Amino acid sequence: GGISVPGPMGPSGPRGLPGPPGPGPQGFQGPPGEPGEPGSGPMGPRGPPGPPGKNGDDGEAGKPGRPGERGPPGPQGARGLPGTAGLPGMKGHRGFSGLDGAKGDAGPAGPKGEPGSPGENGAPGQMGPRGLPGERGRPGASGPAGARGNDGAAGAAGPPGPTGPAGPPGFPGAVGAKGEAGPQGARGSEGPQGVRGEPGPPGPAGAAGPAGNPGADGQPGAKGANGAPGIAGAPGFPGRGPSGPQGPSGPGPKGNSGEPGAPGSKGDTGAKGEPGPTGIQGPPGPAGEEGKRGARGEPGPTGLPGPPGERGGPGSRGFPGADGVAGPKGPAGERGSPGPAGPKGSPGEAGRPGEAGLPGAKGLTGSPGSPGPDGKTGPPGPAGQDGRPGPPGPPGARGQAGVMGFPGPKGAAGEPGKAGERGVPGPPGAVGPAGKDGEAGAQGPPGPAGPAGERGEQGPAGPGFQGLPGPAGPPGEAGKPGEQGVPGDLGAPGPSGARGERGFPGERGVQGPPGPAGPRGAPGNDGAKGDAGAPGAPGSQGAPGLQGMPGERGAAGLPGPKGDRGDAGPKGADGAPGKDGVRGLTGPIGPPGPAGAPGDKGESGPSGPAGPTGARGAPGDRGEPGPPGPAGFAGPPGADGQPGAKGEPGDAGAKGDAGPPGPAGPTGPPGPIGNVGAPGPKGARGSAGPPGATGFPGAAGRVGPPGPSGNAGPGPPGPVGKEGGKGPRGETGPAGRPGEVGPPGPPGPGEKGSPGADGPAGAPGTPGPQGIGQRGVVGLPGQRGERGFPGLPGPSGEPGKQGPSGSSGERGPPGPVGPPGLAGPPGESGREGSPGAEGSPGRDGSPGPKGDRGETGPGPPGAPGAPGAPGPVGPAGKSGDRGETGPAGPAGPAGPAGARGPAGPQGPRGDKGETGEQGDRGIKGHRGFSGLQGPAGPPGSPGEQGPSGASGPAGPRGPPGSAGSPGKDGLNGLPGPIGPPGPRGRTGDAGPVGPPGPPGPPGPPGPP
């Protein structure tokens, strides 16, 4: 046995189905060899963590080799265009795990090539139906990423055991359609690094099997949200090459690594759980530190060694695919039963080392799990419930009072306006620096392979809970619907940082504080959709990332412009009758009649009896009602005020139609619950309505008591004169002053005023203080809820002030002169004319209400004269108070009776008539309808980022995935060495009697 010189490591082929166990007995373990010197090539990129195996027994520690120096990182590879999606293949049955071959001596490590660019993502899963979009808030800025911890140093490997013969190759399954990704689980910290066992004796290196054909990558479509990780399939036994001869003791060159055994196919994905209610999704928080590695699994029995294979050259990494759009989480597939294993392929020749590739961008962190065909796409999850309405803005100021009109019927609601422009998402937070990788320890010889681990049960659900929705804010003022904005461009993902060197395991860093919120971007236009790129090679599955912290609540959207004023509604119902108008003035008194001719002077006769009281005049016709005064401003509908002075309330103003709802603000993640804004200023009280039509006239006043009789003059009584003739009619006295206006009568039938126009809207109130929201739990994006019902109408305003009375109606035309009124109190007697020369006939006093005729006082004795003939009786003057009797003149010689003296001054005014009956109170106008609720105001300002919520529970297992396409047949393995003889088998049962054989040849003749 010479020392086998290892060739460079070739790229790993696709994982085949495990073959059934071979029939050979287990080989004997060779003596342990000395560990080889470690290679000095650069360390390659770290692969995704595999499923933890069972812990093997720790062997004796091998001597560690020198750590190789790490080469400089290559430049970042360009990002590939998304390829077209591949068709999902049928899923193959699961094969049995083959036994591993023993690993040969490790040779010195060759120079490590530069890491290739990451492969593109596979075909996306089917998107579930999109829910109605919720309102979108402004995204908060991502917090800074936490620093990555250092990886622990690897322990020495234990010695390998003998391997069994390889089984026949299994058929590769077709690639299944990628299932919908579930929510990304929180990344657990890695377990502690297992202790590497002491290296066993290296066997001869087996020849490497030929690399399988890589499956064609599907075109990456929209990236689905990460699904719940499926249950990992049991890994196949690692293959080991046959042990080489014992090398010389001391640090010799490292042997070639044996070909890995065919991996077991991935089990069917468990049934996909129903998606839970969606929470409010926040931006991802800072990345957590990488956990420690898990303990190493127990080694299984080693198979028989195979011939060493040559390493193939490294494959080129594909360009990373663009991130797809996250789809709703589909149900997990059910677990499938394992299929029979295929035979192990024969090792291929070692390939030459490939050139170092450029480092690719760091792939997205994937869910853990053994690689295998994905499960079938689950049915889309149920539609989410309606999203909660955003917090309303502060109430606007009450507008000025409009003209009060009659309430009209409620107008139809305006059409809702288009949604406002969508805001641009904020820039992503800065990526934290990656920790340096520690230097790798020396590779010891491989230990015996452990048995295949059982498939692990699905882990328990994480402790997260659905975030509770915050309370709704105060209702905002209706805004004018804005134009629908075009969606903003999706921000381009930032470049991934180069991977740092691997350092020693560092302590777990403390999570840094969340970064400040990024500024809100202006709404962008939708960018043109990029062409699909060529499919890239599948990328490695990364370890699951930590649960991100929920982002800050989006800032409040700006309030939309105030809606246009709605058209005036139709004329409202008749309002209550108005107050009585002012009573019309009394018509003028007719002109005086012509004076009679003077009669002969007669003797003064005795005082005649009082004349009869004139008939009561009929009430005059009512004047035309004056036009209603100008309408006052309508006040807002208020609570019923205290009834004012008795009068009929004015008609209520018609409420104008509500303006169309304002545009919806930009949708964003719901912000934190803001404090209720301060109420807006109270609107001014509206003026009272216009005065009502003139009421009916009040009842006629009652007749006043008669006036006092005049006192007799002081002169001595004169001689009784002869009854004179009727004197000439006196002149008509001046018109009496009009009576006072009576109390308002009952409501008149006047027309109602037209509805007043709405007053201008008041200024918006000041926004409320910024609320401090608790940090929400990261949830899945909810499907958009249906539109909420309009809010309840706001509370009624205070009652409006009573408006000023309307102006008096115009004076109506004088009515026709009515019949004479009731007789007034008798006037005082007129004074006699002075005796002597015959005076000119006195003028009649001004007519008043007809009163009793005053007694004539005795005049002073006049000079005796011839008795005059009685004068003719003058026509009765218009009824009016008789003037007071003048003082008696000085005594003179009795003369003939003088002519009738002038009428005395008008008597006192009669008592005011009784107040007419109070008119019935007018019907109260109904309160105006409450205005339609305005659209929600701008959302409140964003609250501070709340603490990270616990992880949500894991969903139930999904349905089984589709069968993968069968893999290519592997090459037949080399026959293993003949094992030791087995135990003796038991004697078999006697078989059935066979048919008689053919007759034999005749025997020799017998002895004579």
Swiss-Prot record:
Family: Belongs to the fibrillar collagen family.
Signal sequence residues: none
Keywords for the protein's UniProt record, in alphabetical order: Extinct organism protein, Extracellular matrix, Glycoprotein, Hydroxylation, Phosphoprotein, Secreted
Modified residues (5-hydroxylysine): 91, 254, 329, 571, 682, 850, 912, 924
GO cellular component labels: collagen type I trimer; cytoplasm; extracellular space
Other remarks on this protein: These protein fragments were extracted from an ancient femur bone collected in Roseburgh, Oregon, USA.
Composition-biased stretches (Low complexity): 105-121, 139-157, 205-235, 362-388, 397-416, 475-484, 519-547, 604-618, 631-658, 687-703, 731-740, 752-764, 825-840, 894-908, 942-975
Sequence segments annotated as region (Disordered): 1-1008
Role according to the record: Type I collagen is a member of group I collagen (fibrillar forming collagen).
UniProt biased composition (Basic and acidic residues): 55-69, 909-923
Residues with the Phosphoserine modification: 97, 607
Free-text tissue specificity from the UniProt record: Expressed in bones.
Protein's GO biological process: blood vessel development; extracellular matrix organization; ossification; response to mechanical stimulus; skeletal system development; skin development
One GO molecular-function entry: extracellular matrix structural constituent conferring tensile strength
Major localisation: secreted
Modification sites for 3-hydroxyproline: 705, 980, 995, 998, 1001
Taxonomic lineage from the root: Eukaryota, Metazoa, Chordata, Craniata, Vertebrata
Name of the featured protein: Collagen alpha-1(I) chain
Cellular compartment(s): Secreted; Secreted, Extracellular space; Secreted, Extracellular space, Extracellular matrix
